Amino acid sequence: MVTENKEIPEAAKRDLKIALITLKYTQSNSVCFVKDGQAIGVGAGQQSRVHCTRLAGQKADNWFLRQCPKVLDLQFVDGIRRADRDNAIDVYIGEEYMDVLADGAWEKIFKVKPEVFTREEKRAWLDQMKGVTLGSDAFFPFSDLSLIHISEPTRLAL
């Protein structure tokens, strides 16, 4: 291992194993982000490893945004189906959040109209993500992760 630190923590070893097992069962040209024993973002089937990494990074960011107290505290209407709840969360944390916050839409999903999850709030939450493992089924054809344009929080969490 080419690094000054020659010891890998047990949690990192576990996450590396999970990344490799996950990658074994995905399409070729795959990338996987793992945190705390679970795959949180997988990118596969794209034309380049750059695109796979970007896709996996976006999924990892979305996974972490779902852990934010502002998202966990959303109050859904009684009887909402799990798929509808999950889709509403995905839209809420994304760029098209007004699709679920607009008058006439939010009442079908939420008991109380949620506040907008601002870009600044998302950035502040994502900046707290640490200890993410990145696995790939092959080498990266570039030397610097900044070249692949994954989100800054995901890059810093690696």
Regions of interest found by a model, annotated:
Residues 1-30, 34-40, 48-130:
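Long, structured protein-protein interaction/assembly regions in large complexes
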Residues 51, 143-144:
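Residues that form or flank phosphate/diphosphate-binding pockets in enzymes
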Residues 121-122, 144-146:
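Short glycine-rich, acidic/polar surface loops and turns
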Residues 130-132, 145:
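A short pocket-lining beta-strand/turn micro-motif at the edge of beta-sheets
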Residues 134-135, 155:
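Short glycine-rich phosphate-binding loop at a beta-alpha junction
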Residues 135-143:
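Extended C-terminal subregions enriched in glycine
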Residues 146-148, 152-157:
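Residue-level detector of conserved catalytic or cofactor/ligand-binding positions
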